[in-house]
């Protein structure tokens, strides 16, 4: 087991403007720039570069709200992603992307990206040869124009301003001020190439954050109304997030920790943290007013898979790496047996004083530690278990993520499945001590370095004062 650098997690103080990474592109348009609305029959063509350029973002702004900056703007965007160019319709608050048509499924194009509000009222994104990659599905519903409201809601309306389609009905990873999300709705992080992604879900009895890995789902944060009251919907106000019942009465509230009015709620694509944001006029950016999780080790991926997040917020490998894997910068999952089972093939490595932030997985109650370990070795989908000696509970995991160091007196024991014979020659007891002692040594070294540096600074300062007194006398 080797110590790693501290996890790459920082408090989310602000959003960096997207234009820092963008480039100017040539835009052909037919009805002007940033109108108050777009009428049916409108068509805009955004040129796509011939050669791929990493970090490229090109936008043509269509309509905007008449508010003090930062205001809402709708744009057609071409973005360089995974060696291709993605075409999308998006809404921005200042320079922060708050809605995107390609959040769940990207539309890749070459040569051009076309936005069209057809004469029969359908809003479409098209590529070469009129290939349609996204549409509103509002054909022949009386749609007359596209507007963006002061709330940031992008809407298609008919001649009497009845809404036929709205972006608020298709939430992505952001919830705006004034927006309402009903029970069974969720926000999701952008998946990208990873098999892991996060979600913020509104359930009948709670709101919760989830980690999704393949077909596996685990919660890692939740907030419940008192007295087991049921939730009907949530709404974001100026001073926090409100939870409401079926009668529209507020039953719980998550308050902002700043005086400035809130503008949006966001689910972090990298960390999976949930945060409320306000706009700082002095710094000219958005800053976090509240975060659901404030400790690195309480994040599901505060450390990489098969790493332990320690008390000092550093990451340590669980161990059992081959020589080839030790030479790599990443821990990897070494000899952890994924997809294997049977007592003749696998055994359990026991880590005392180690727990997990992941919840809601399968569990068994009133079982012994030995029974807990045996059930995992017999289950090919199980790679680890968390056993509580106090509650006699056994929690089963299909991933080794969200693992963190806990107090030994908590009575928690984390066990991972390894190939049979991995512990041979060391003995189970010695191997367990080896893993935990190394975690303790890493933390101890950090503490010694901090206090040693402080002592050195104080001694140097005292010597300088003594020399100054001698010179003056």
Q: What residues fall within each predicted segment?
A:
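Beta-rich ligand-binding surfaces for carbohydrates and other polyanions
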Residues: 2-473
């Amino acid at each position: 087991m080797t110590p790693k650098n501290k996890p790459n997690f920082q408090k989310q103080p602000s959003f960096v403007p997207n234009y820092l990474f963008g480039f100017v592109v040539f835009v052909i348009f037919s009805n002007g720039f940033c109108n108050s609305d777009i009428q049916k029959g409108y068509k805009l063509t955004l040129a796509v570069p011939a050669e791929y350029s990493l970090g490229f973002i090109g936008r043509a702004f269509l309509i905007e709200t008449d508010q003090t900056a930062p205001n809402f703007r709708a744009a057609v965007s071409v973005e360089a992603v995974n060696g291709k160019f993605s075409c999308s319709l998006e809404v921005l608050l200042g320079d922060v992307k708050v809605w995107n048509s390609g959040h769940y499924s990207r539309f890749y194009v070459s040569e051009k990206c076309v936005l069209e509000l057809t004469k029969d009222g359908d809003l479409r994104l098209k590529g070469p040869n009129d290939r349609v990659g996204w549409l509103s599905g509002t054909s022949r519903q009386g749609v007359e124009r596209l507007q963006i409201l002061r709330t940031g809601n992008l809407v298609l309306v008919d001649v009497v301003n009845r809404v036929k389609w709205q972006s608020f009905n298709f939430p992505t990873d952001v919830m705006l001020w004034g927006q309402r999300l009903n029970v069974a709705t969720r926000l999701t992080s952008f998946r990208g190439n990873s098999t892991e992604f996060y979600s913020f879900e509104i359930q009948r009895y709670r709101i919760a954050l989830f980690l999704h890995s393949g077909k596996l789902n685990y919660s890692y944060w939740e907030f419940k109304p008192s007295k087991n009251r049921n939730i009907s919907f949530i709404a974001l106000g100026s001073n926090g997030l409100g939870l409401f019942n079926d009668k529209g009465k507020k039953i719980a509230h998550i308050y902002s920790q700043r005086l400035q009015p809130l503008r949006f709620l966001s689910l972090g694509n990298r960390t999976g943290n949930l945060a409320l944001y306000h706009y700082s006029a002095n710094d000219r950016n958005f800053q976090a007013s509240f975060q659901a999780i404030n400790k690195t080790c309480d994040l599901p991926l505060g450390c990489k898979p098969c790493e332990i997040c320690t008390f000092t917020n550093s990451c340590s490998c669980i161990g059992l790496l081959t020589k080839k894997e030790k030479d790599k910068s990443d821990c990897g999952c070494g000899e952890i047996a994924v997809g294997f089972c049977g007592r003749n093939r696998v055994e359990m490595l026991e880590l005392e004083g180690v727990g997990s932030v992941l919840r809601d997985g399968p569990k068994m109650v009133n079982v012994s530690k030995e029974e807990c370990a045996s059930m995992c070795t017999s289950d090919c989908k199980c790679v680890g278990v968390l056993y509580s000696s106090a509650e006699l509970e056994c929690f089963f995991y299909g991933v080794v993520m969200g693992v963190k160091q806990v107090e030994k007196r908590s009575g928690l024991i984390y066990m991972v499945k390894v190939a049979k014979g991995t512990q041979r020659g060391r003995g189970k007891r010695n191997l367990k001590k080896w893993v935990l002692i190394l975690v303790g040594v890493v933390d101890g070294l950090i503490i010694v370095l901090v206090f040693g540096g402080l002592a050195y600074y104080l001694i140097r300062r005292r010597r300088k004062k003594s020399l100054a007194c001698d010179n003056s006398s």
